[in-house]
């Protein structure tokens, strides 16, 4: 750990202006971003008596090796710049509002030509409208009911494409649960109108649709069209069934998000209820680990930044009112920022009495329950992860804790399309943002050991180069200027070395990895190999493997890392192999570039289907005219068909 005194700036050097500051570790990686009205006052607090610091703050200042700051013109600029840098650098010690993944969302993919309704979890996507979260059962029941009135497609892209090619709809089309845009029963514009109406109903306009249907039902009765009137009656009943599931909790013209916080010394649980047209339309939850001793008002400030600042969220994500337990100190700047994002006035208020205050109490109760659930789950997960990492450290006789593990795997078929994967685990948790893929060509692709030597050399050579570049940058004079934009420096790919390298294989792969590190002069990274057959752990230059008990949590962690590296490598290999197969068949066709080759493969779904297509089918692909289609067909016919073989058994799958 670094000594904070070694990089503490002199008090007189720190300005008293508002600004944003960044702590960096020994590898130059940003580990914490914060803002302050008075930079001098805030930064000196980090270098106070260590006894007064929270455990995570203590860890942060002792992990950091430098601190920098940028002066801005106002608190609003500081708010915007802090948010931008947190999104760009993803600092490990900043508050990370992790969604409660217990419940999924009902999503409508409005960004597609033919929007579809589906259940989604995880990260939000641009161009998609989200409603919820709800229980999976509630979503299924809601969708099944609403498709009677708004028959939007729910099928997967592959099912939709098959229906387009065959001219026959799927089962949902035959039972009137889909408008069947795949075969042209409705146009793209008509189908989009249905999707818009579906979203409007879910967004709180249910009474308008029910009223319209009741009016149409009365007109049908007046015209003696009783069959149509009966259908409309059933639609009204279906919509009322969905509408009445959400009890009215506030006045019908109320659009608000209601936040509550429950915290202890180290963590905080946040809950929000989304109220639209007076009804609860969704609920979300987060749990955060605190770096500083933040009061609820400061937590709310960070929360509003992350919830409403995400550009990928849907356009109506910000309501007219935001109800919070305490007002942030910079409520005026937050209100101005949120009003600018919404394009209309936003109010941030603390409910004092009445229905809103009562609902706030309910949200607070949910936050308290969420904290209890989180702690019970985390206790089990953290115990298992800590046990696994400690078992590995003891079994391998390593001097330092395993903060970061990297695992490498090679994938190919008979030496062709050789690729490698690198997966990363930090504190026992996969860090997918730092996964890497490698293409291996030339002499390095002759066998697995040469490939492993090549990959390890490339990864750590890049690390050494980036370390050298950062060292040179730190020797240059640093000037702190007023700034209104985020840093534009590119993100580092390999700036953080592992404590342990795991390779998929036995002594040959381990020896190749150790040789690559030794040739680069790297001696502080441990290397092991995990052999598949008996799950033996091999160390460099050892004649006998380390055998971990079958019930060992450490072995289980190694197996999961190895299997994840294998999965990641195979997926890249299949992708590369598919591209090479298409290219080898279609190379040399005049006028057929890479983009048109991709369009052909995307349209037909596989090389086999492309080979069986005739000229008229090929010419249906956008950008492929009759002449070019004829040339493609000729190129395909000139290739002698090779039988597909199961490489594990030698069986010929097709002739």
Curated annotation (Swiss-Prot):
**BP GO annotations:** nucleotide-excision repair; SOS response
CC per GO annotation = cytoplasm; excinuclease repair complex
* SMART domains reported in the protein's UniProt record: GIYc, HhH1
Keywords of the record, alphabetical order, are: Cytoplasm, DNA damage, DNA excision, DNA repair, Excision nuclease, SOS response
Question: Taking every annotated instance into account, which residue ranges of this chain make up the domain GIY-YIG?
Answer: 16-95
Report the residue ranges that make up the UVR domain in this protein: 207-242
State the function annotated in the UniProt record: The UvrABC repair system catalyzes the recognition and processing of DNA lesions. UvrC both incises the 5' and 3' sides of the lesion. The N-terminal half is responsible for the 3' incision and the C-terminal half is responsible for the 5' incision.
On assembly, the entry states: Interacts with UvrB in an incision complex.
Q: What is this protein called?
A: UvrABC system protein C
Which gene is transcribed and translated to give this protein?
uvrC
């Amino acid at each position: 750990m670094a000594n904070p005194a070694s990089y503490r700036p002199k008090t007189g050097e720190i300005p008293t202006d508002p600004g944003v500051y960044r702590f960096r570790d020994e590898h130059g990686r940003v580990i914490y971003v914060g803002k302050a009205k008075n930079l001098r006052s805030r930064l000196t607090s980090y270098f106070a008596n260590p006894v007064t610091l929270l455990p995570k703050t203590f860890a942060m200042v002792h992990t950091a090796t430098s601190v920098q700051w940028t002066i801005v013109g106002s608190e609003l600029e500081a708010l915007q710049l802090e948010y931008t840098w947190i999104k760009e650098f993803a600092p490990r010690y900043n508050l990370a509002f992790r969604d409660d993944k217990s419940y999924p969302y009902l999503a409508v993919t409005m960004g597609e030509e033919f929007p579809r309704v589906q259940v989604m979890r995880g990260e939000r996507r641009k161009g998609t409208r989200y409603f919820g979260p709800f229980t999976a059962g509630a979503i299924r029941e809601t969708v099944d009911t609403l498709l009677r009135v708004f028959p939007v497609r729910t099928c997967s892209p592959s099912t939709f494409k098959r229906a387009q090619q065959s001219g026959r709809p799927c089962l949902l089309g035959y039972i009137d649960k889909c408008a069947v845009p795949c075969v042209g029963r409705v146009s793209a514009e008509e189908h989009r109108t249905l999707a818009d109406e579906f979203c409007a109903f879910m967004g709180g306009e249910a009474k308008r649709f029910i009223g319209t249907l009741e009016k149409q039902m009365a007109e049908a009765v007046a015209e003696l069209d009783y069959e149509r009137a009966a259908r409309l009656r059933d639609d009204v009943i279906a919509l009322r069934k969905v509408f009445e599931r959400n009890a009215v909790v506030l006045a019908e013209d109320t659009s608000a998000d209601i936040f509550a916080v429950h915290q202890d010394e180290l963590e905080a649980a946040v809950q929000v209820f989304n109220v639209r047209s007076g009804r609860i339309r969704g609920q979300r939850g987060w749990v955060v680990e605190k770096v500083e001793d933040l009061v609820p008002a400061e937590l709310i400030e960070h929360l509003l930044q992350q919830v409403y600042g995400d550009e990928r969220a849907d356009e109506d994500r910000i309501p007219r009112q935001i109800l919070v337990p305490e007002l942030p100190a910079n409520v005026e700047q937050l209100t101005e920022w949120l009003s600018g994002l919404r394009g209309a006035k936003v109010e941030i208020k603390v409910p004092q009495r009445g229905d809103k205050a009562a609902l706030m109490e309910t949200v607070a109760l949910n936050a308290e329950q969420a904290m209890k659930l989180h702690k019970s789950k985390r206790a089990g997960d953290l115990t298992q992860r800590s046990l696994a990492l400690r078992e590995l450290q003891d079994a391998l006789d390593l001097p330092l804790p395993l903060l970061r593990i990297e695992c490498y795997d090679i994938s190919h078929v008979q030496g062709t399309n050789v690729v490698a994967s690198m997966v990363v685990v930090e504190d026992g948790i996969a860090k997918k943002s730092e996964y890497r893929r490698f293409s291996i060509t030339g002499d390095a692709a002759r066998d697995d050991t040469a490939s492993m030597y090549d990959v390890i050399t490339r990864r750590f050579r890049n690390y050494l180069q980036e370390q050298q570049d950062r060292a040179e940058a730190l020797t240059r004079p640093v000037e702190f200027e007023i700034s209104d934009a985020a840093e534009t420096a590119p993100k580092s790919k390999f700036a953080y070395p592992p404590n342990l390298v795991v390779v998929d294989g036995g002594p040959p792969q381990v020896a190749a990895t150790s040789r690559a590190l030794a040739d680069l002069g790297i001696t502080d990274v441990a290397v092991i190999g995990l052999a598949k057959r008996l799950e033996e752990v091999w160390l460099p230059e050892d004649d006998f493997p380390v055998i971990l008990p079958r019930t060992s949590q450490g072995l289980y962690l190694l197996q999961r890392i190895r299997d994840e590296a294998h999965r990641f490598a195979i997926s890249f290999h299949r992708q590369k192999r598919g591209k090479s197969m298409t290219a080898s068949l279609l190379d040399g066709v005049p006028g057929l570039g890479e983009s048109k080759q991709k369009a052909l493969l995307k349209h037909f779904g596989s090389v086999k289907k492309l080979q069986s297509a005739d000229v008229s089918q090929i010419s249906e692909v956008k950008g492929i005219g009759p002449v070019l289609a004829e040339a493609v067909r000729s190129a395909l016919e000139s290739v002698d068909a090779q039988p597909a073989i199961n490489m594990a058994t030698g069986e010929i799958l097709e002739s």
